[in-house]
Amino acid sequence: MTKSELIARIAERNPHLYQRDVERIVSTIFDEIADALARGDRVELRGFGAFSVKRRDARMGRNPRTGETVDVDAKVAPYFKTGKQLRELLNGGESESDDD
């Protein structure tokens, strides 16, 4: 699902909201999550999951094509850990919000 598909689905399920307002809300949520991660904060959406940042140390790597060793710089990468309700839903269980 793309961001525009998500916006369209939310607007469909909430006919009292204008699609442009839903777009602003979704964009604001994504921006806030990205800003929090950029600050090094953790974002927890209980039941859904938690976004955090993992720091990876610099290391020696190997070019798989040539076998040559190369320096791999330290980096920061986003990380997502699923919440219990989402894991249960994906594994065939029922989630509490299935009563739509």
Curated annotation (Swiss-Prot):
Protein name per the record: Integration host factor subunit beta
Primary gene name: ihfB
Family: Belongs to the bacterial histone-like protein family.
Single GO biological process annotation from the record: DNA recombination
Entries under PANTHER family matching the protein: DNA-BINDING PROTEIN HU, INTEGRATION HOST FACTOR SUBUNIT BETA
Any matching Pfam family: Bac_DNA_binding
Organism per entry: Rhodospirillum rubrum (strain ATCC 11170 / ATH 1.1.1 / DSM 467 / LMG 4362 / NCIMB 8255 / S1)
InterPro entries: Hist_DNA-bd, Histone-like_DNA-bd_CS, IHF-like_DNA-bd_dom_sf, IHF_beta
One cellular component term from this protein's GO annotations in UniProt: chromosome
Key word Metal-binding present: no
GO molecular function, a single term: DNA binding
